[in-house]
Amino acid sequence: TVSDPPARPAVFHSREELMNYVRELNRYFAIVGRPRF
């Protein structure tokens, strides 16, 4: 089974927090979007 997407904080307290979230999201979609044969 595929893990759930990263939890989105209600508020981003810093630019770093936002960037970390976006990075995790990209990693998640890279895994989920991989074609399965």
Swiss-Prot record:
PROSITE patterns: PANCREATIC_HORMONE_1, PANCREATIC_HORMONE_2. One of its GO terms (cellular component) is extracellular region. Disulfide bonds: none annotated. Keywords: Amidation, Neurotoxin, Secreted, Toxin. The keyword Zinc-finger does not apply. It is found in: Secreted. Expressed by the venom duct. It comes from the Eukaryota. The keyword Secreted applies. Pfam families: Hormone_3. The modification Phenylalanine amide is found at residue 37. One of its GO terms (molecular function) is hormone activity. InterPro entries: Pancreatic_hormone-like, Pancreatic_hormone-like_CS. Its main location: secreted. Belongs to the NPY family. Causes hyperactivity such as jumping, rapid circling and tail flicking, when intraventricularly injected into mice brain. The mature peptide does not contain cysteine residue. This is Neuropeptide Y1-like conopeptide. It comes from Conus betulinus (Beech cone). The lineage of its organism: Eukaryota, Metazoa, Spiralia, Lophotrochozoa, Mollusca.
